[in-house]
Amino acid sequence: MALPTAQPLLGSCGSPICSRSFLLLLLSLGWLPLLQTQTTRTSQEAALLHAVTGTVDFASLPTGLFLGLMCDEVSGLSMGHAKELAMAVRQKNIVLQVHQLRCLARRLPKHLTNEELDALPLDLLLFLNPAMFPGQQACAHFFSLISKANVNVLPRRSLERQRLLTGALKCQGVYGFQVSETDARALGGLACDLPGEFVAKSSEVLLPWLARCGGPLDQGQAKAVREVLRSGRAPYGPPSTWSVSTLDALQGLLVVLDESIVHSIPKDVITEWLQGISREPSRLGSKWTVTHPRFRRDTEQKACPPGKEPNVVDENLIFYQNWELEACVDGTLLAGQMDLVNEIPFTYEQLSIFKHKLDKTYPQGYPESLIKQLGHFFRYVSPEDIRQWNVTSPDTVNTLLKVSKGQKMDAQVIALVACYLRGGGKLDEDIVKALDNIPLSYLCDFSPQDLHAIPSSVMWLVGLHDLDKCSQRHLGILYQKACSAFQNVSGLEYFEKIRTFLGGASREDLRALSQHNVSMDIATFKKLQVDALVGLSVAEVQKLLGPHIGDLKTEEDKSPVRDWLFRQQQKDLDSLGLGLQGGIPNGYLILDFNVREAFSSGAPLLGPGFVFAWIPALLSALRLS
């Protein structure tokens, strides 16, 4: 399972010393009274006490001791010891909490060399005062490290972040509101805090950065972003020219769009984009690729430090910095030890880096040997990723379905099953049972070819509105399967079962159904194929609808009722006594042209106007003959 932050691993010290946290360390430094109670002197305790008489070797201490560090304990350390402690935290890749970092920063010496800064944890530097580094060279080095730190450790608009931003701009030589791409890279995460005046003057540089910022924009930033987008300036141009990829790129800026901007975006673009994110929610604010651009930048600039490349997935990776995970961990190592990836409590951020590494290792999709070992890691895979897979084993499908149960992963599950069917797989009883809690509307998401692999027994589970978004081709295939599934059912029970699938029924099927007085409701009638419906006579439709025949009047101006009316003799419609209009007047010919075959324009089925237009030509031809 994943945890929001790294937690101490139980038993990582190998003795009860971890449960006493940092007390023994403080005792070893000689400024805490001796414990009144006697404790068992383990080898680790002896090492701590030995530190009093010599140089303190913090790097040799167990990781668990650092994780329990308290402010009161740190305040008793000398500045030299505090610096050595901080360096050990960096060396051991230990993740400290905010209050621990702040306390430790207060005890550091006021003068630090570049070499000493390099040896400190990056996130610890966020709590240092930039005034400690006067001069262009010193401040440039300090802020080059800050740009790689996770500034979100500090709350947005906190005094510490404001102090860092002011210092960074001054060090970079920015005195107006214009910043370059180089300036933005130098600021790193601090670029997310630049006020609206900077956004207005440097929109081409800053808007892509703001789109990737994790937190909400402040009022000034949001106003400036809206003005830039409304004006059609770079980098996105006028809203009327936006595409689906533009909306994807906007990401965190979408929330500031106002009504005037939204109305300027082409409607078909909005529709396509909304359909895309409904199928793949991970496209909206995806954290796999854009949330932390600094990780990719760090990887390009830094190689894996000597001795840091792991040969096994273990707890030590928890304490790697994110850039070290990117630089040092190999995708094939992760693929071969997915059981350990799932067992160790990595953070969500670390797991996202692991996924990025796997995606780079297998750009054409994960092999099935890896897929069957994904376990809980399956939760971090998007439907788009799954569509690249080739899954042939029902055991693989069943394993991942168990992992996804209760996790709100319908989109991933549907993509997985579709992938399996595409590879020639068949839905067995276990897979069908695992899909019980997912609405069967997923049948519409499969390709028509995949539907042939669905067992007919599944049709018994389809609900009344499950197929509402299915295409005509889907319905035609599913109707045939439903007929097979319900072949031993008759009467009204048969109609209740087959009703959901009637959108795929042919004219002959509807004609046969009309002989059973099924009393079809108008909602079902409206879902019938137009091509099948228009060939039915008034008497046949009357038998189909039964007591619901009067509902035709409310739908006479809408398809498919309108299409059916155009093909009927008006005198037959009059016999219903409903006042239906639009039929063919008495004495006129009924011409049955197949428009789709005769005309390449794909016009709708013939109405009376089309028929009337041809009658004079036909009469002239008859006179000539």
Curated annotation (Swiss-Prot):
Glycans are attached at residues 390, 488, 517. It is found in: Cell membrane; Golgi apparatus. This is Mesothelin. InterPro entries: Mesothelin (IPR010335), Stereocilin-rel (IPR026664). A lipid is attached at residue 600 (GPI-anchor amidated serine). It comes from Rattus norvegicus. It comes from the Eukaryota. Specifically expressed in lung. Overexpressed in hereditary renal carcinoma developed by Eker rats. The modification Phosphoserine is found at residue 202. One of its GO terms (biological process) is pancreas development. Membrane-anchored forms may play a role in cellular adhesion.
